[in-house]
Amino acid sequence: MTKLKIKSGDTVRVIAGDHKGQEGKVQKVLIEKNKAIVEGVNMISKHEKPSASNPQGGIKEKEAPIHISNLSLIDKNGDTTRVGYKEEDGKKVRFSKKSNEVI
């Protein structure tokens, strides 16, 4: 299993696939599938049956998972960057390899 360098709450840009160039915030990371759900990216239509809580039913838009190899982290400067790890004050922290700033 590979090390996931993207976490929930990170801002990412899609670098490959149909949604290339779109940006969004990571809502959830699916570790076992190496995928992430990104806000506003890879939208799908979900057909819902009428139920007691939703008597109308209908078609809902929702985000589908996207593979993490198609995502790149955006640092504070707005550039895509790779992620590195270093120790600071005895704690392991992530840092941007482009700007060398702690994420």
From Swiss-Prot:
It holds the Pfam family ribosomal_L24. SUPFAM superfamilies: Translation proteins SH3-like domain. InterPro entries: KOW, Rib_uL2_dom2, Ribosomal_uL24, Ribosomal_uL24_CS, Ribosomal_uL24_KOW, Translation_prot_SH3-like_sf. One of its GO terms (molecular function) is structural constituent of ribosome. GO terms for cellular component: ribonucleoprotein complex; ribosome. It comes from the Bacteria. CDD domains: KOW_RPL26. Keywords: Ribonucleoprotein, Ribosomal protein, RNA-binding, rRNA-binding. One of its GO terms (biological process) is translation. Transmembrane segments: none annotated. One of two assembly initiator proteins, it binds directly to the 5'-end of the 23S rRNA, where it nucleates assembly of the 50S subunit. Part of the 50S ribosomal subunit. HAMAP family: Ribosomal_uL24_B. Belongs to the universal ribosomal protein uL24 family. This is Large ribosomal subunit protein uL24.
